[in-house]
């Protein structure tokens, strides 16, 4: 896997998501949730974890050939395994399961300090670079 440097989306900047590494068909992203991302119980809100997983899966699609120039999720399923604490770094590892001409299926694991927080799967509409 490589350690890329590139411009990220405004949503990634707002959430504090950072691209850690990519490989063919995979991407790792991280974020460290802040207190304003907590739910009423004081744990990280599930929507923040969902956004992180969606970001990892979408970014993994940008690593395949022919190149994907746009990926938009139209189905996202999450299973929450354990609570995430504010201030602990969450690492999401996304991977491409299958990519056709117009749609792709992906999967993701979200972990905190080696502990599984959530698993996810997603289906994306993709636009590929013309060959």
Protein language model features and the residues they cover:
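Terminal targeting signals and extreme-terminal segments of soluble enzymes
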Residues: 1-131
């Amino acid at each position: 896997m490589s350690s890329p440097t590139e411009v990220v989306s405004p949503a990634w900047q707002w959430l504090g998501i950072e691209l850690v590494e990519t490989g063919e068909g995979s991407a790792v992203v991280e974020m460290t949730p802040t207190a304003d991302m907590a739910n009423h119980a004081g744990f990280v809100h599930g929507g923040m974890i969902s956004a992180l997983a969606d970001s990892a899966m979408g970014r993994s699609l940008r690593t395949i050939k022919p190149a994907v120039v746009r990926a938009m999720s139209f189905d996202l399923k999450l299973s929450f395994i354990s609570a995430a604490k504010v201030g602990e770094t969450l690492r999401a590892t996304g991977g491409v399961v299958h990519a056709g001409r117009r749609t792709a299926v992906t999967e993701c694991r979200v972990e905190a300090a080696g502990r599984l927080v959530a698993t996810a799967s997603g289906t994306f509409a993709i636009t590929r670079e013309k060959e």
